[in-house]
């Protein structure tokens, strides 16, 4: 069996993939966010939400559904350099969050800031440790820049990363947030080694 065939066999047999499709979500990432939401009460926050790296829109779908079910009218703005199919109740910005024009557009749609930032700006690890360190530092810098600009006091930032990068990013965030927790759940396959950082401000 070739590498692609092996991946496909794992993919279709994955219980999280089956569950996500049964719920009508675009990918298995919905299951991961649902677990994190159950653990940390993310969607129970009475606040606007900013989502970074939103394409293909799985987290946006989950946010939209949970907000509709709860009757919340808070705004959700998602940003990505890649195009994304429209999600009901979510305002999408096709742009780079590190660019001034995109930041200005986010500000115009979320003038009062947000209480929750969800981030999936997570480039895959490089086999070159030096290059990977640079990429990790850039991600941490971007998260801090966006948090300082938009995150309200007491707000939370949830960032998806890889285990190999989690400690580095957490060490940076701990200097700027009152609490930082690293979480990894059963829906992260071992060869992916995904981890999630929950950073909460004062």
Swiss-Prot record:
It is an enzyme of class 2 (transferase). One of its GO terms (molecular function) is rRNA (uridine-2'-O-)-methyltransferase activity. It is found in: Cytoplasm. InterPro entries: RNA_methyltr_RlmE, RNA_MeTrfase_FtsJ_dom, rRNA-MeTfrase_E, SAM-dependent_MTases_sf. One of its GO terms (cellular component) is cytoplasm. It catalyses: uridine(2552) in 23S rRNA + S-adenosyl-L-methionine = 2'-O-methyluridine(2552) in 23S rRNA + S-adenosyl-L-homocysteine + H(+). Specifically methylates the uridine in position 2552 of 23S rRNA at the 2'-O position of the ribose in the fully assembled 50S ribosomal subunit. This is Ribosomal RNA large subunit methyltransferase E. It comes from Tremblaya princeps.
